[in-house]
Structure formats: structure tokens, C-alpha cells
Amino acid sequence: MALVHKLLRDTYILRKFSKPTSALYPFLGIRFAEYSSSLQKPVASPGKASSQRKTEGDLQGDHQKEVALDITSSEEKPDVSFDKAIRDEAMYHFRHLKDEIVDHWRGPEGHSLHEVLLEQAKVVWQFRGKEDLDKWTVTSDKTIGGRSEVFLKMGKNNQSALLYGTLSSEAPQDGESTRSGYCAMKSRIPRGAFERKMSYDWSQFNTLYLRVRGDGRPWMVNIKEDTDFFQRTNQMYSYFMFTRGGPYWQEVKIPFSKFFFSNRGRIRDVQHELPLDKISSIGFTLADKVDGPFFLEIDFIGVFTDPAHTEEFAYENSPELNPRLFK
């Protein structure tokens, strides 16, 4: 029903604007917009598209010039097959849904249950092309009037992602903000068929594994859980990642038990364990108040099981150890 409503709305917009432009793409489906933009604009006949005018005779002489105008008749409309657009959009999502059902019966992500149970390590994100960069988004304090800038591109030989930019802690001149200076990179929420929100299940692993190369700056690694409650949209679990600098790669291993709970950027007194069975996204934030250029190169981001790590949770919440929190 939602798909039909979206396409009917797209039909109305396309009738109001006979020539699809990039400004309409946010209102149209991706595949529907590509289909509409591929249509050829009808060309007006020479008889209807030409007119004559007389130039200034006193200055340049008495001669006329025919000026061709590209005018499209109001009766001529683009030949749009909305049935085909609806059918293509629906078939695309149904094929995606079929793949999800088949993979579910085979096992998690199409792997057999035996392989999943024996899996000790898994690469979740790697950067080998532009399609891998499209799974991420970058932001900075420029959205609130700051001066920091951040960019994301493929690294050398298209074997890594390079996050770079300039950090500025100068506060915006808006009369309200007193602090500024951050740059961030965040993964997009995975989507299934019919744009359903998906999540990652890392419950069988206990450690985050990264291969990075930085300039010596400290970064904050943020993990968000999948939730449908509006009150939890600003909640996340964080821990620090320290880069060494220099030309060599470093392997960073962070146990999930070390991640602490925060809300709206403030660490909470009552801590909670990271729910590994419903991970929504992961991100990296730089806010060390050191103005100047920075970079962080990422080879891959994965998870693995470390048999030497037996800690379940690093922060105690029992009433016996901290009774003030449980009054």
C-alpha cells in the first residue's frame, strides 16, 4: 500500500512538472526517477518554434532576423508509462524480498547454520570501490554554523577509505553556541526489501576489529542500537580509539564489554550492556579541540571472537557496589 501511494504521488508530481529535473528526485523513487529522466523530450516543429522580430532600423539598417525559440506546445506531453514504472519498482523489491527469504531458510545471510556457529571472524565493512563509500555519510559542525570540514574518498589503489578534512573549534557567531569543533563519519542504516529497516547481529562475537592508519589523533567509536523509540535516537555506546600516526597500519581491537552508555553526548551514571543482537550503525567522531588538518584511513571494519577475553561487562551496576544509583 505504501508503494502504491508513493508511485501515485510521483505521478502527480510528474504531471505538474513535465520535465523531470534533479530537484524532483527526493520526491520520486530512485528507479522511478531514473526511468522518468531517460524519456526524450518531444521536439517542437519548426513552424511552431520560430518567430521573427525587427531590429533597430535607425541604427543598423532595415533588415530582419529570424530567431528560433525552443517552445514546447502545451498539448504535447511526454509519453510516460506509469504502469511500467510501477511494475519495475514492485518487481525490484519483490526480487529483493525473495533473496531475503531464500537466505533466511539457508541460514543467516545465506550461510548454513553450521558455518555460522563455527565462524570466528567476520568483515562487516570494507572499502574496495565507490559502492562501499555509498554506505557511509560524513558530517561536521558546519551544519550548525561551524568552520570544520570533512570529506570521504577512496584511498590509494582503491583499497581503503580516506577520511580527511580540517577541524576548527571556533564557535559559530549565532549568539547561542559556545562550543564547536567536531567531524564524524557514520554508516548508513541497512535497508531490506520495500525499504525495511534492518540491523546487524553480532551476538556471537565479543570484539570489534579494525585496521586503520591515522595521524596520532584520538577518535571516538560510536555504536548505535536499532530502536523504534524516539526517546532513544540520541543514545549510543562509545569507546576511544587512539591512532599512532606514521606510515604503518595498526590493528585495533576493542572488546564490546568496554563500550559505555551515553545519551545526548553525556555519559550516564547507570550503564547498560551493548545489545549486540540489534546493531544499527557504527561511527567515528573527532573532537579533540586541536585545530588543523586530520586524516583517518580505514582498510576494513569487522568483528571476531577473542577466546582470551572473558569479561562480560566492564562497568558495575549492582546495588551493593553502587547503592546511590538504585535508590
Swiss-Prot record:
Subcellular location(s) per record: Mitochondrion; Mitochondrion matrix
Residue ranges of the region described as Disordered: 42-63
GO molecular function: unfolded protein binding
Gene Ontology cellular component terms for the protein in this record: mitochondrial matrix; mitochondrion
One annotated GO biological process: mitochondrial electron transport, NADH to ubiquinone
Segments of skewed composition (Basic and acidic residues): 53-63
Signal peptide: none
Transit peptide: 1-24
Record keywords, A-Z: Chaperone, Mitochondrion, Phosphoprotein, Transit peptide
Oligomeric form and interacting partners: Part of the mitochondrial complex I assembly/MCIA complex that comprises at least the core subunits TMEM126B, NDUFAF1, ECSIT and ACAD9 and complement subunits such as COA1 and TMEM186. Interacts with ECSIT. Interacts with ACAD9. At early stages of complex I assembly, it is found in intermediate subcomplexes that contain different subunits including NDUFB6, NDUFA6, NDUFA9, NDUFS3, NDUFS7, ND1, ND2 and ND3. Interacts with TMEM70 and TMEM242.
Function: As part of the MCIA complex, involved in the assembly of the mitochondrial complex I.
Family from the record: Belongs to the CIA30 family.
Name of the protein described by the UniProt record: Complex I intermediate-associated protein 30, mitochondrial
Native source species: Gorilla gorilla gorilla
Organism ancestry: Eukaryota, Metazoa, Chordata, Craniata, Vertebrata
